[in-house]
Swiss-Prot record:
Record InterPro entries: RNaseH-like_sf, YqgF, YqgF/RNaseH-like_dom, YqgF/RNaseH-like_dom_sf
SMART domains: YqgFc
Its job: Could be a nuclease involved in processing of the 5'-end of pre-16S rRNA.
EC category: hydrolase
Disulphides: none
Organism placement in taxonomy: Bacteria, Pseudomonadati, Pseudomonadota, Gammaproteobacteria, Pasteurellales
Originating species: Glaesserella parasuis serovar 5 (strain SH0165)
PANTHER family in the cross-refs: POLYNUCLEOTIDYL TRANSFERASE, RIBONUCLEASE H-LIKE SUPERFAMILY PROTEIN
Enzyme nomenclature, EC number: 3.1.-.-
Protein name: Putative pre-16S rRNA nuclease
Keywords per UniProt: Cytoplasm, Hydrolase, Nuclease, Ribosome biogenesis
Amino acid sequence: MSQTVLAFDFGTNSIGCAVGQSITGTAQGLPAFKAQDGIPNWEQIGKVIAQWQPDLLVVGLPLNMDGTEQPLTQRAKKFANRLNGRFNLPVELQDERLTTVEAKSEIFARGGFKALKKGKVDAISACLILESWFEQQS
């Protein structure tokens, strides 16, 4: 059974978003959400959830390279809990180590410095989070 999944790359100023299907295992970036000190516009997130009707949400979990938690880890977990509480959808956490670095190098390879716009980085990071989640499911 194919699932539609939305993924989020949590940040204090911007939250990347991507949508994907489990049947293809691929993700497509969506516009990033602005956030103020980690608090998103929940109405905008609600509209995206209503539009895509996901079966599941995935939130990137920022960890240090050694696997220990960093200051942003707890905030990402809190964001995941709030998604679950507000939208009554299952939420899973996905290790996101190196996704931002990987996203920046992918964007730079395609378009140089001009292409390194923050929203694009967040969207591609969310795609990488979702695609790595799909890989772990298979």
